[in-house]
Amino acid sequence: MARVRESTFALVSYVDRVSIDHDSAVPPYRQLAAILREMIASGELAPGATVPPIKRLRAEYGVAETTARKAVALLRDEGLVETVNGWGSFVRKG
């Protein structure tokens, strides 16, 4: 449970500074992935931390569930996060 709280606080502190530009030529899922990628790079989402759940990403950034899932999948494909079925997605360690 501590992991969820840790990443939730990070999301709340970061969401005040960024948002999704729905008029941009960059697809929303790529914008959201960039936001999460920056949170990982800056340490706001530390190795082992839980990536905010899809429902939380939807609510905070005003995106569709599919958009949030594609953003997390992109980070998984890049090797930045790993998903454990039934547990969620976590920032990869090392």
Regions found by a protein language model. Give the residues of each.
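Extreme N-terminal segment that seeds HTH/winged-HTH DNA-binding domains in transcriptional regulators
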Residues: 1-66, 70-73, 77-82, 87, ...
